[in-house]
Amino acid sequence: MPGGLLLGDVAPNFEANTTVGRIRFHDFLGDSWGILFSHPRDFTPVCTTELGRAAKLAPEFAKRNVKLIALSIDSVEDHLAWSKDINAYNCEEPTEKLPFPIIDDRNRELAILLGMLDPAEKDEKGMPGTARVVFVFGPDKKLKLSILYPATTGRNFDEILRVVISLQLTAEKRVATPVDWKDGDSVMVLPTIPEEEAKKLFPKGVFTKELPSGRKYLRYTPQP
């Protein structure tokens, strides 16, 4: 599909109608991190579980200065009515209020602009719906991460939170996070940092894994 964003691209400063009124995207983000995530349709089973989990994790994102905003091709009216079902799914009072807004993209303008349409999933009129896309933007409004899932597979919002924690850590410190890393685990020293500099940067210690190649590139340090 036309449109789409690449890592490092600045988010378009679009305007949109949402469940909390009309927004301009850059103003909504402010100086926060932001997650824009699309779902195929309101009142569907997988989407209900996804937004329910996002709502449960919203306080964890908020304390890390991350704003959430959802999007689909449904109307604001549908979003508000569906929010009651989402809250009921979470065993909470079935109100129209969620801890994040949902964008009304019934004309698919943003879905086309951002490359969010899934040509394999069509509505009753034969029009493509939105895929399960996740965009993570930094305070500089640049895209730091993108994830694209098909309609049939729900996303793991705990994994999205884990990735955001990694993105924020590695934006501040000269480290990388290894496979299956969790907050609090040891991290990896970037291979571009000379050994003597690494000792100064990481006073908790740098631990090198000995390898048959003799190359000292697997270097760990406790999470800064």
UniProtKB/Swiss-Prot annotation:
Record-annotated site: Important for phospholipase activity: S32
InterPro entries: AhpC/TSA, Peroxiredoxin_AhpC-typ, Peroxiredoxin_C, PRX_1cys, Thioredoxin-like_sf, Thioredoxin_domain
Entry keyword Lipid metabolism: yes
GO molecular function, one term: peroxiredoxin activity
Residues modified to Phosphothreonine: T44, T177
Catalytic activity: a hydroperoxide + 2 glutathione = an alcohol + glutathione disulfide + H2O; a 1,2-diacyl-sn-glycero-3-phosphocholine + H2O = a 1-acyl-sn-glycero-3-phosphocholine + a fatty acid + H(+); a 1-acyl-sn-glycero-3-phosphocholine + an acyl-CoA = a 1,2-diacyl-sn-glycero-3-phosphocholine + CoA; 1-hexadecanoyl-sn-glycero-3-phosphocholine + hexadecanoyl-CoA = 1,2-dihexadecanoyl-sn-glycero-3-phosphocholine + CoA
Chief location of this protein within or outside the cell: cytoplasm
Phosphotyrosine: residues carrying this PTM: Y89
Top-rank taxon, per record: Eukaryota
One Pfam family here: AhpC-TSA
EC numbers, comma separated: 1.11.1.27, 3.1.1.4, 2.3.1.23
Ranges of residues in domain Thioredoxin: 5-169
Cellular component GO terms held in the UniProt record: cytoplasm; cytosol; lysosome; mitochondrion
Residue(s) carrying N6-acetyllysine: K63, K209
Region (Required and sufficient for targeting to lysosomes and lamellar bodies), start-end ranges: 31-40
Modified residues (N6-succinyllysine): K209
Subunit structure: Homodimer. Interacts with GSTP1; mediates PRDX6 glutathionylation and regeneration. Interacts with APEX1. Interacts with STH. May interact with FAM168B. May interact with HTR2A.
Family, as annotated: Belongs to the peroxiredoxin family. Prx6 subfamily.
Main function: Thiol-specific peroxidase that catalyzes the reduction of hydrogen peroxide and organic hydroperoxides to water and alcohols, respectively. Can reduce H(2)O(2) and short chain organic, fatty acid, and phospholipid hydroperoxides. Also has phospholipase activity, and can therefore either reduce the oxidized sn-2 fatty acyl group of phospholipids (peroxidase activity) or hydrolyze the sn-2 ester bond of phospholipids (phospholipase activity). These activities are dependent on binding to phospholipids at acidic pH and to oxidized phospholipds at cytosolic pH.
Protein name: Peroxiredoxin-6
Gene: PRDX6
